[in-house]
A protein has these predicted regions:
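Active-site HxH/HxHxD metal-binding segment of metal-dependent hydrolases
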Residues: 1-56
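Short amphipathic alpha-helix with an adjacent loop that forms part of the alpha/beta core around
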Residues: 57-62
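Metallo-beta-lactamase
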Residues: 30-31, 65-144
Length: 145
């Protein structure tokens, strides 16, 4: 726990999207109570905050062609990285094949519709195997109705 705080102490730049900034410290009190873990909160003055709109220019400076988009669903601060080569990295977002189980979750559906509006081939998840999404991407929508 708290690896981001430890990385910042080592001098590594932490980049945070503006849609995530309000959630940076929401779990600090919980983790600080756990005596068997060393937890280091992230100092606010070490946050490098960029907007989703700025993400393409930011990534381009790193040699990456793509952008970062806001995709709530797993949590209110979820983001996804969309690469121009047709790859999306969606982290903890619920896998596309499971979305039907959440038929009343318009936030999740809207996030998937936003992701699928790009010309995607493959999605990489944080906790699931990669998925070929070209079938979904052809329709440019994921309608749960």
């Amino acid at each position: 726990m708290g690896i981001a705080g430890e990385l910042v102490e080592l001098g590594i730049k932490l980049v945070v999207l503006d849609v995530q900034s309000d959630f940076i410290h929401c779990s600090d009190n919980i983790f600080l109570k756990e005596k068997h873990h060393i937890y280091k909160p992230i100092p606010d003055d070490k946050l490098n905050i960029i907007s989703c709109k700025e993400s393409r220019n930011f990534l381009e400076k790193l040699g990456i062609n793509g952008e970062i988009i806001y995709t709530p669903g797993h949590s209110h601060d979820s983001i996804s990285i969309i690469l121009d080569e047709g790859i999306a990295i969606v982290g903890d977002l619920d896998p596309i094949d499971n979305v039907l189980a959440y038929n009343e979750n318009n936030i999740l559906r809207n996030s998937w519709n936003k992701i699928l509006s790009y010309n995607l081939k493959v999605v990489f998840y944080g906790h699931a195997n990669e998925r070929d999404v070209s079938f979904y991407a052809l329709s440019n929508t994921f309608d749960m109705n």
